[in-house]
Amino acid sequence: MEALVYTFLLVATLGIIFFAIFFRDPPKVPNK
């Protein structure tokens, strides 16, 4: 169970950082 909790916390942290950077300034990198 602890592995699940740590994995969830890791994903949540990465998600928060990603959204913070994403909303800080609009994406300028082309998808292709």
Swiss-Prot record:
Bilayer topology term: Single-pass membrane protein
Subcellular localization(s) per the UniProt record: Plastid, Chloroplast thylakoid membrane
Keyword Heme: no
Matching Pfam families: PsbT (PF01405)
Alphabetically ordered keywords of this record: Chloroplast, Membrane, Photosynthesis, Photosystem II, Plastid, Thylakoid, Transmembrane, Transmembrane helix
Main location: plastid
Transmembrane feature ranges: 3-23
Family as reported in the entry's similarity comment: Belongs to the PsbT family.
Oligomeric and partner information: PSII is composed of 1 copy each of membrane proteins PsbA, PsbB, PsbC, PsbD, PsbE, PsbF, PsbH, PsbI, PsbJ, PsbK, PsbL, PsbM, PsbT, PsbY, PsbZ, Psb30/Ycf12, at least 3 peripheral proteins of the oxygen-evolving complex and a large number of cofactors. It forms dimeric complexes.
The protein's name: Photosystem II reaction center protein T
Species this protein is from: Psilotum nudum
Gene behind the chain: psbT
